[in-house]
Curated annotation (Swiss-Prot):
This is Tyrosine recombinase XerC. It comes from the Bacteria. Pfam families: Phage_int_SAM_1 (PF02899), Phage_integrase (PF00589). The keyword ATP-binding does not apply. GO terms for cellular component: cytoplasm. It is found in: Cytoplasm. Keywords: Cell cycle, Cell division, Chromosome partition, Cytoplasm, DNA integration, DNA recombination, DNA-binding. The gene is xerC. SUPFAM superfamilies: DNA breaking-rejoining enzymes (SSF56349), lambda integrase-like, N-terminal domain (SSF47823). Residues 2-81 form the Core-binding (CB) domain. GO terms for molecular function: DNA binding; tyrosine-based site-specific recombinase activity. GO terms for biological process: cell division; chromosome segregation; DNA transposition.
Length: 306
């Protein structure tokens, strides 16, 4: 089992790579985790009783502060389990003050198009790195993969003829993820140039490309596409995948399966994105709305006659 200090460093590196966390954000996570460790002992080995004592220690803090500290720990333990550094997750012992969840950051359709147009222009050179980058973003936005899932994909996860990937997500749970025709073409182009005996689809000298490198490549692509690099990250492209699918009419349960969420409540945060469309849909399609519109039309005609 990893020592807490090393595990914290790995966790912070993941936040920077997958979520584009700024230096101040990373410093806040570090303070929360190290503060919790001072109260509960070694976080990497801490059990539920030790974590339950944190609730008492935080009793004088504002609910928002408690929620932030508890969230940092839940994410930390989720990361440890995800990376195989720990088998159990003791974070259920942490307090859960009632707080509204922040809305996920995303990109507009036009911003995604600009990002892809730039990547496609660069891939036309048939040079390996631009072709690889196009394949990466096709899978991020086209299949909604987590950064960790994407960079660690084995070659065996990509069947030649079936339009699906076999992805191992959080907790070692496998799921089937559909791959678009565009993504398959990009993958085929990359496989033709890959030139490696590595078992990984996106190999590096040691194993596979890292989340940090994927994060850097997306930032660099955003700059070349004349987009704000602060708005672009693997995490944001995954959110864009979910947001745009929901806008297009995808069922929330289907979206839950595609994203690999264990709990539908995690997926429900995306329902905010389509509120305007849903209101318009009810106003236009609901039988009573149509009836009310008919009455308004009749009243308008009577006023005209008068």
């Amino acid at each position: 089992m990893a020592k807490a200090s090393a595990a914290i460093e790995e966790f912070l590196a993941m936040l920077a790579a997958e979520r584009g966390a700024a230096a101040n954000t990373l410093a806040a996570y570090r303070r929360d985790l190290e503060g919790a460790e001072a109260l509960a002992g070694d976080l990497a080995t801490a059990r539920r009783p030790a974590l339950s004592r944190l609730g008492s220690a935080w009793s004088d803090l504002a609910p928002a502060t408690v929620a932030r500290k508890a969230s940092a720990l839940r994410q930390f333990y989720g990361f440890l389990v995800d990376e195989g550094l720990r088998e159990d997750d003791p974070s259920s012992a942490l307090p859960r003050p009632t707080m509204r969840r922040p809305l996920p950051k995303t990109l507009s359709h036009k911003e995604v198009e600009r990002l892809f147009e730039q990547a496609e222009r660069e891939a036309e050179t048939s040079r390996p790195l631009p072709v690889r980058l196009l394949a990466l973003i096709e899978l991020l936005y086209g299949s909604g993969l987590r950064a960790t899932e994407l960079v660690s994909l084995p070659v065996a996860a990509v069947p030649r003829d079936a339009p699906f990937l076999t992805v191992t997500g959080k907790g070692g749970v496998a799921r089937m993820v559909p791959v678009s025709g565009r993504a398959r073409e990009a993958l085929q182009s990359w496989m033709g140039l890959r030139g490696s005996d590595s078992p990984y689809l996106f190999p590096s000298r040691k194993a596979h490309i890292t989340r940090v490198r994927l994060f850097q490549m997306l930032k660099e692509l955003a700059v070349r596409a004349d987009l704000n690099p602060d708005k672009v990250s693997p995490h944001v492209l995954r959110h864009a995948f979910a947001t745009h699918l929901l806008e297009g009419g995808a069922d929330l349960r289907v979206l839950q399966t595609l994203l690999g969420h264990a709990d539908i409540s995690t997926t429900q945060i995306y329902t905010h994105v389509d509120a305007a469309r849903l209101v318009a849909l009810v106003n236009e399609r609901h039988p009573l709305s149509a009836r009310a519109a008919g009455k308004r039309s009749t009243l308008a005609e009577k006023r005209t006659e008068d």
